[in-house]
Structure formats: structure tokens, C-alpha cells
Amino acid sequence: MKALRVFLLAIALMMASGAMAQTVRNSSGSSCGQIESNGTIRNSSGSSVGRFDSDGTIRNSSGSSIGKIDSDGTIRNSSGSSIGKVESDGTVRNSSGSSIGKVESDGTVRNSSGSSIGKAEGIKREWAAAYFFFFPFY
């Protein structure tokens, strides 16, 4: 019975540590940082460089608001002006409505030409779009 408890505890710890942060990769597959499930954004050295709050606020490393993601996918700058939008299919548009890329369901991030510019697997599409297109933390 004790061995079973230890085994279950080990599995729970492995699952919890895997769910804590997802690696963000550039087009060559190299890690350019991590986004934790609580929204903390870390650079490739592991230092906190910002965060996505649960209300959509995007903060820099000093905690100042630098933008916001609305519930409809609109991305705003610190002044509240719309700078883009993430549509439900992952298409990313700039403030004029032109497509500038896409975040696919598997986390692949593509530019407007369809070329892969990175990977953000297991991360909210809106967070990935903000990270790669509007607020480059890497």
C-alpha cells in the first residue's frame, strides 16, 4: 500500500511540474522562453519578464500594465487603443484588420506568408499571439 502511495505521489508531481510552464520556441526550434500556467512569462534564462493576468492585463517585468487582451480576442496597448485581434480560428489581425499571422491549434505560430515563426504549444492562442506579434518578450 505504501509503494502505491509513493508511486501515485510521484506521478502527481511529474504531472504538476509539466503543467507549470510551456516552452515557447522560435522558428529554429530553440527555446526563447516559457509561459507558466499562471501567466508568468520567462525569458530563455528563466528570469521573469512579464505576465498575463487572469483579467487579460499584460504586464512587463516591473508589473506595469503594457496592454490587455479583451474577452473577444482584441489586443490593446497601454493606452487602451486596439492594436490587433485574435479570431476564434487563430487568425491574428493588426489594427487595420489585415491578417498578420495565425496561431494554429497545435501551437504553431505562422506569419502572414504562412512560414512558421515559432511554437507555443499548450498556451492560450491569445497569449501566443500577444507574445509573438505585439509584445515580444524574447
Named regions from a protein language model:
Residues K2-S48, S54-S65, S71-I83, S88-Y138:
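Long terminal segments
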